[in-house]
A protein has these predicted regions:
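Short, small-residue-biased leader/transition segments that mark boundaries at the very start
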Residues: 1-13
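Glycine-rich, often acidic-flanked micro-motifs
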Residues: 14-21, 53, 60, 88-89, ...
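Intrinsically disordered, low-complexity, positively charged segments
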Residues: 16-35
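Charged, amphipathic alpha-helical linker segments immediately N-terminal to NTP-binding catalytic cores
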Residues: 32-75, 235-238
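P-loop NTPase catalytic core of nucleic-acid-dependent motor ATPases
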Residues: 59-97, 101
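Walker A/P-loop nucleotide-binding motif
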Residues: 104
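Conserved lysine of the Walker
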Residues: 108
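Post-Walker A alpha-helix
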Residues: 111-112
Length: 238
């Protein structure tokens, strides 16, 4: 089967799939006929089986593994569009995108949900787990995709990035800007790296531009509305 989806209202992706999971996942993202795809991807049964073999959880299906493989295949082709996949949650607030990332289990979803509650009616999710980050005309944007985590927080939207914030747990709520060297040490763990050497060189240049042009912060916080206030007061003014 073939599915087409429009990512962030700008990039049309066509994927060939075996299991109906993908069709359901992309249902609200599908476009009418007439769009020429920017990216076309498909994955093999061997790739699906390799992905499946890497999981031990009984709840993981081959259909879910196919979805993971397809997004990985998409990520490999994004460099041609000055874009990459990042692990993180992105909120849109007053026309700006705020990117939050953290080590697994720290609580980026919990923190971003607090933002949505705190700024009721103003803040919304662009993507809750794996957004596409893209440089367009010298400006960095975050894009929603159908791959948005188990909570399915996200939308078919995009916004220019205001700031990127690394979340850590803390008893008190503190935020500080960090230098490029520390940014590199932290952010590269959250990016999808292409495998082939030529694409990797191009990717590294793109990632360097990402680090140079955007402000990065570390937020040490607890689970409270004050954590949102402390973060917003700094991030919104950069």
């Amino acid at each position: 089967e073939i599915s087409e989806c429009l990512v962030g209202s700008e990039m049309c992706i066509r994927d060939s799939y075996k299991y109906p999971y993908i069709e359901q996942q992309c249902e609200t993202w599908r476009v009418n006929e007439g769009y020429e795809p920017d990216i076309e991807v498909s994955v093999t049964d061997e790739e699906i089986e390799t992905e499946y073999a890497g999981y031990r959880a009984e709840s993981v299906s081959r259909a879910l593994c196919e979805s993971t493989c397809i997004y990985r295949a998409i990520a490999r082709k994004l460099i041609a569009f000055q874009a990459f996949v990042m692990h993180g949650a992105v909120l849109e607030l007053d026309g700006k995108a705020y990117v939050f990332t953290a080590k697994s289990g720290v609580g980026k979803t919990t923190h971003t949900k607090l933002w949505v509650e705190y700024f009721e009616g103003r803040a919304s999710y662009i993507n809750g787990d794996k957004p596409i980050i893209r440089c367009k005309d010298g400006v960095w944007y975050a894009y929603g995709t159908p791959w948005m985590g188990k909570e399915k927080f996200g939308s078919q939207s995009s916004a220019p990035i205001q700031a990127v914030c690394f979340i850590e747990r803390g008893e008190e709520n503190k935020i500080q800007k960090i230098a490029d060297k520390e940014v590199i040490d932290r952010v590269f763990h959250q990016l999808f790296f292409p495998e082939d050497p030529e694409t990797l060189i191009e990717f590294m240049g793109l990632a360097d531009d990402f680090v140079q042009k955007l402000p990065f912060f570390v937020l040490k916080c607890n689970i409270s509305a004050e954590a949102v206030r402390v973060a917003y007061e700094t991030l919104s003014k950069v």
